[in-house]
Amino acid sequence: MKTELSLLDRSLNLQRYPKRAQELLQAWDAGDEYIIKYVEEELNLEDGKNILILNDNFGALSCWFSDKHNVTMMTDSFVSQRGTLKNLQRNQCNRVQLITSTEEMPQGFDLVLMQIPKNNRMLTWQLQQLRQSMDSSCPIIAVNKAKEIHSSTLELFEDYLGETKTSLAWKKHRLVFSNANVSNPKTIAEAVCWSVDNEDIDLLNYPNVYSGEKLDQGARFMLDHIPSDPELRHIIDLGCGNGVLSVKAGQLNPEARITCVDESFMAVESAHRNLEVNLGKERQFQFIANNCLDGFKKHSSYLVLCNPPFHQGQAITDHIAWQMFCDAKHILCKDGKLLVIGNRHLDYDGKLCRLFGEENVTTVASNSKFVILEAVKAEKSK
């Protein structure tokens, strides 16, 4: 896979995070290249400008513009943040301030660059924050694949931010130009709250939480199959989202210590709030933004709950699920269990059989769309 971004007589070595032996995906896209070309060729910025970059996938924009400017990068993704840091170090770039989506949006910028997020509610929230934080003279330039920029996308920019126009397409990407100048902007709440039908569970969801406006069908199915067992002293919810599975596990296992892990800072913050509200602040909880289970001790958990994502940013991929399964096996105690929910077509059973052994993988439940699989770590497993 190509790792050298060569553009305008400059080169950067950029790699995705975490680094894989046989990487199939690139650490930047044509959208990054389009923004770089436009800023360098059309804006003629003086050195030392203050630039805010939102949703930089693996730091291509941060690395490039930190050469001559003061860059702040804001993201909801732990993986993107860590990947950006690694690429900054790899290219010996100037210091970039890295902040998370749960922090207050800073002010005082001369230019804002944005990779448009996949989640429309996250986009709307970021546009609202930009309208409140940026001067009307500050150019805001966003990018996405042309096929993903609809008239409804541009309406969001105009309703929540200000006057908006678009570029011509280049390498199947398009730029969106806007300024924070709408006189009567629409507003949205920071969080969406709702209750789970037929459960004693109330959930708060920050903007970038997966399925934040209603319970996804996979999680709904999984709720009915979470075990209750006094031997489950430590339960990990891997890819926890808003923490709904953790809340149910905590209700069924009141003595268990529960750890919620997600690569989204907003998901982790949502889970933190939801476990404390539904289960009480006196319980033993831990909330970690992380790349899967990096850094967890071996043989440290009795049950891992897992509802894996099948995309990383805009890219469709199954390597995250595979890493989750491998990490879960590593940290499970002997006879510990991994409970996985997934779409039937994703072949998680094949992956789990390869990893845990066919005799240690069983189907707990299935319906027309989903399957719940249990993998047990046998005594001989390492």
From Swiss-Prot:
**Recorded E.C. number(s)?**
2.1.1.174
Which InterPro entries does the entry link to? Answer: rRNA_m2G-MeTrfase_RlmG, RsmC/RlmG, SAM-dependent_MTases_sf, Small_mtfrase_dom
- Spell out the Pfam families in the cross-references: MTS
| Residues in the signal sequence | none
Gene Ontology molecular function, alphabetical? 23S rRNA (guanine(1835)-N(2))-methyltransferase activity
According to UniProt, the reaction catalysed is: guanosine(1835) in 23S rRNA + S-adenosyl-L-methionine = N(2)-methylguanosine(1835) in 23S rRNA + S-adenosyl-L-homocysteine + H(+)
Q: Its GO CC terms?
A: cytoplasm
Q: Where in the cell is it found?
A: Cytoplasm
Q: Which UniProt keywords apply?
A: Cytoplasm, Methyltransferase, rRNA processing, S-adenosyl-L-methionine, Transferase
CDD domains with a match to the protein in the record: AdoMet_MTases
Question: Which enzyme class, named as a word?
Answer: transferase
Q: What is its main location?
A: cytoplasm
The record's HAMAP family line, in alphabetical order, gives: 23SrRNA_methyltr_G
Give the protein family: Belongs to the methyltransferase superfamily. RlmG family.
Q: What does this protein do?
A: Specifically methylates the guanine in position 1835 (m2G1835) of 23S rRNA.
* Name under which the protein is recorded: Ribosomal RNA large subunit methyltransferase G
Which organism's genome codes for this protein? Aliivibrio fischeri (strain ATCC 700601 / ES114)
